[in-house]
Amino acid sequence: MKTQGLELETVIDIKHKPVSFTGGLEFESLTYTVTKKKKVDGKWSNEDVDLLHDITGYAPKGCITAVMGPSGAGKSTLLDGLAGRIASGSLKGKVSLDGNSVNASLIKRTSAYIMQEDRLFPMLTVYETLMFAADFRLGPLSAVDKRQRVEKLIEQLGLSSSRNTYIGDEGTRGVSGGERRRVSIGVDIIHGPSLLFLDEPTSGLDSTSALSVIEKLHDIARNGSTVILTIHQPSSRIQLLLDHLIILARGQLMFQGSLKDVGHHLNRMGRKIPKGENPIENLIDVIQEYDQCDFVGVEVLAEFARTGMKPPLLSDMEEIISYTNSIAPSPSPLHRGSKYEEKSQDFSYSSQISRRSLNDEFDHSIRSPYNNTPMSWSASNSAAFLKFTPSRLKNENKVQKPPSHASPGIYTYSSEILPATPTPHSSDYVVDENDYLTPTNSSQEHLGPKFANSYIGETWILMRRNFTNIRRTPELFLSRLMVLTFMGVMMATMFHNPKNTLQGITNRLSFFIFTVCLFFFSSNDAVPAFIQERFIFIRETSHNAYRASCYTIASLITHMPFLALQALAYAAIVWFALELRGPFIYFFLVLFISLLSTNSFVVFVSSIVPNYILGYAAVIAFTALFFLFCGYFLSSEDIPLYWRWMNKVSTMTYPYEGLLMNEYQTNETFGSNDGVSITGFDILKSLHIGTEEIKKRNNVLIMLGWAVLYRILFYIILRFASKNQRS
């Protein structure tokens, strides 16, 4: 096939439509080491363990690359490493996109990562979920264009029949598991990412739903995206849709190539596939045999995949043991963390028994077309590496023919799948082979702004979604409103017409402290909702859907009118029924800011804890501490000096004192003691509460300060700590 004078020979026929394999994601010598504690002879010591060890490979553009292997092989770890979800400095090696080295930030801006769990709002419909995703990701497009894109995507994903169905959850009937997974995929491909990472996309699905999901991913790949997924035990029909396989074991590369190469790979190892047996399952069984062997491990298979050095047959191990016992042992160093570190097996037997020439029988076609040498990714072959990237096609008269690695089977080609967004390494971006290992500023500029919408635009979209969710789940808001209204009526009837006695004063103080406690405990039921929303936030912001600051502000603005209505309902009932003194507006403000403060505290705690059980425990524990030190049981002067600081940090102190000042900053008499009248000022002085008018204003400002502080802490946690990233 000739294209602008260039000869492109590496193509795959999809219903007789050639698709070039030029370009893709390449990775070199990826190593990820973690430190684990190990107990030896009763003592704990640190041990370095390689979760990934010197993995080099590639994922062709326009293809589905499946990462497979036994449990604990490092599949998800490799996926996280390629997707930039491992903290900077922890992962060693290079990742290149179309011949240019890229960092984690650049990968996130050109890719989408679909988690194994479907994190979606249950009370949004399929259309609304995808429409909000379009609003976040396709900012510059008009509303009409966004709707058209969403409608087209719904049709392509086979979701037309469930377009207006709620996503649903355990308590709400919604779409099926397969449809939910396709919605998750749609949310992350609405903007046409060049790279698509999926962690176990078929997990928990029946065979039909799993096949449907992979078919949609196949169509997405055929339109120019690089699709990389982890998968466990795919069916034979799904295997036919997988173009490129990467098989791992204990963090090492065991095999790389197409499905048809698996049998050839096993034959070169001296293993034959039994008739009718699945080649992939047979290879994984062989890997596990070596892994469970007491004398050799999967390292010999990794060496075979890397250099072509044939591993020993396990049936010949008696001969090998006899031979190695006749010579001085010199154990081969194994990578850190392997369970075979203490084995004394001498792998030099390979040179005597089963060493093969690297070029005689080893088929290097299973390797990346960008690297045709037996050694991995040396600087000397960087020029050859770049010849197969789109940016080099303009300058080469002829492209070398990479080995064929077409997948078997006939596929259905869909020309209407949304095209991938251009990567920063498209054909108009020329790369110098001398500096391709360092991402340039121009590649960053080529991508445009980091976020699709303006600050105000993001906040408005988030507010609209929040209001929609609140409208669909009125029980959370209405339950609090009903509780506060009911308790207001109860308090009004219980504390009506207090007597002008010391007991009457005590009763009125009890009313105020109960009111404060009621408002502080009323938001505890929101912990599960905030934790669920946090997981969705992590998924959406991992690839720059919106800013954490916009999310924080939108959440605050959305809840303010509902909190104000709750405070107003309670204040209006008890104020007039109990004939309270002082300005009504101040009484309302204290209650409203109390709700605002406790709401901010709850969302802050929810951003830290891993689950709602710990969230409930933490919120209740801290609220109890605030209650203990608010000044009701012991005045601020009577609290021991070493605990007095708790009175200042207790967020209940200020609304409690504020309500008392609003009621008792007066010379009116509220009772007598031994014939001496007790005025409102006397009550405040006995409780060591200020009698100045300015103290009322200061208390409100301090309460606002606590609410703002908790929101700032909430933002900091979201911005810097709530990242779905390995350390």
Swiss-Prot record:
InterPro entries: AAA+_ATPase (IPR003593), ABC2_TM (IPR013525), ABC_transporter-like_ATP-bd (IPR003439), ABC_transporter-like_CS (IPR017871), ABCG_dom (IPR043926), ABCG_transporters (IPR050352), P-loop_NTPase (IPR027417)
ABC transporter domain mapped to chain residues: 25-275
Transmembrane segments: 476-496, 511-531, 560-580, 584-604, 613-633, 700-720
GO BP terms, alphabetized: arbuscular mycorrhizal association; response to symbiotic fungus; transmembrane transport
Key words of the record: ATP-binding, Cell membrane, Glycoprotein, Hydrolase, Membrane, Nucleotide-binding, Translocase, Transmembrane, Transmembrane helix, Transport
Subunit structure, as described in the record: Heterodimerizes with STR; the resulting transporter is located in the peri-arbuscular membrane.
The family this protein is said to belong to: Belongs to the ABC transporter superfamily. ABCG family. Stunted arbuscule (STR) subfamily.
Name by which UniProt lists this protein: ABC transporter G family member STR2
Organism: Medicago truncatula (Barrel medic)
Gene: STR2
